Amino acid sequence: MSVKAIRNIIFDLGGVILNIDPQLTVDAFRNLGWNDFYESGNQPLIKELFRNLESGNSSPEAFRDNVRQMLKYQKDDAEIDTAWTAMILDIPADRIRYLEELKKSYRIFLLSNTNEIHRIKFHMRFEADFGYSFYDLFERNFYSHEMGMRKPNPQIYLQALKESNLEPEETLIIDDMEENIEAAKTTGMKVLHIQPGTLLESLPDYLKDNH
């Protein structure tokens, strides 16, 4: 049986296209007075809080209220959002130029575990830096909080494939998280696991060897 050529590429966002530093958010919350943020005893509760936001099970308003309860201080929405989005850094222009070139030969998509507070932040940053909507960079943007589930749930990959009418065997997915890559493999897609910030070093070589 012949191997089908890659026609579609699904990108992760954070660590692949967007530079992020989660430690900056940890530091920002500590600066708000959350001194035991992410210490071992709090980790399960914190992870549940973040995952509920990313899967759309919690609204931004409920998230902020939960953060206020944990802070035990009445910080306003803007202070909480600033701390929560502190991890969001830049999108290097050379990555965007590369994606714009890829669009000439491939259908490109985005599939990201994210939330509405972060989405607003990086969309605004992208438009300020590049002069057009982030929605226009990809054929379709799939966000976990809008889909009601998050990676590595295999169903999120299957739904993205179905809604975009993609054949798994013709689709490459790129992610910097090994657990997400392992889940994507179960759908029949081709996979590329990269280290954060190495898209321009990793993808061209992969496509050259797997054209």
Describe the residue ranges of each PLM region.
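N-terminal helical cap/lid subdomain that shapes the substrate entry/recognition surface
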Residues: 3-93, 104, 115
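Short amphipathic alpha-helical segments and helix-helix/interface helices
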Residues: 26, 96-100, 181
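Glycine-centered loop/turn motif at secondary-structure junctions
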Residues: 33-36, 72, 106, 165, ...
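Alpha-helical transmembrane segments and their immediate juxtamembrane flanks
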Residues: 95-98, 112-120
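Hydrophobic beta-strand scaffold residues
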Residues: 108-110, 191
